[in-house]
Design a protein with these regions (language model features):
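Charge-rich, low-complexity N-terminal segments
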Residues: 21-170
């Protein structure tokens, strides 16, 4: 009602109760959160305590988007996201993330091969990990949904007090 009234007062086209008059401009979203994922990292460029190897209990919030819901009316079927849960279990659970540029990474992994479950990525800041997760999960979701749905954003929680997000520019 409000949209129709505003449109009549300001000569603006109205999309009716569904919003945009162009269905391709609509987007549905939903999100799934995976909690209590223990893994470690070290910020080798940090001047403080974060330069030491340390761990957190992380949570990964994945926001999905689509323009057209599936035949059940879902953006994604939460029960069908086992491929993401498996990737998290195999790559992050009790892992140690190292930045590609960390000067001690190679030596540590060589000297202590059984001490670490390593994952080497470009940046191990919370922001960098969020970007890595986006770049990993988005192609997986697109493949699983035949391109109908995608990852819109990753919000990565470092314990309960800090978080960072990554989403590509529109």
């Amino acid at each position: 009602f409000l949209a129709v009234w505003l449109a009549s007062r300001h000569n603006v086209p109205c999309g009716g109760p569904m919003g945009s008059p162009n269905p391709s401009l609509r987007m549905f979203t939903c999100s799934k959160t995976y909690r209590d994922i223990p893994f470690a990292h070290r910020q080798h460029r940090h001047e403080g305590h974060c330069s030491f190897l340390h761990g957190h209990n992380w949570a990964i919030e994945i926001e999905f988007g689509c323009e057209r819901l599936d035949e059940r009316g879902f953006v994604v079927d939460f029960g069908g996201l086992g491929f993401l849960k498996l990737w998290i279990a195999e790559n992050l659970d009790h892992a140690c993330l190292f930045a590609q540029s960390d000067p001690v990474r190679e030596q540590l992994l060589k000297d202590y091969p059984k001490l670490f479950r390593p994952l080497v990525i470009e940046s191990v800041s919370t922001e960098g990990i969020a970007q890595h997760l986006f770049e990993t999960f988005d192609p997986m979701v697109r493949q699983e949904t035949a391109g109908r749905a995608w990852v819109r954003q990753i919000i990565l929680h470092e314990d309960t007090k800090n978080k960072a997000s990554y989403q590509p520019k529109a």
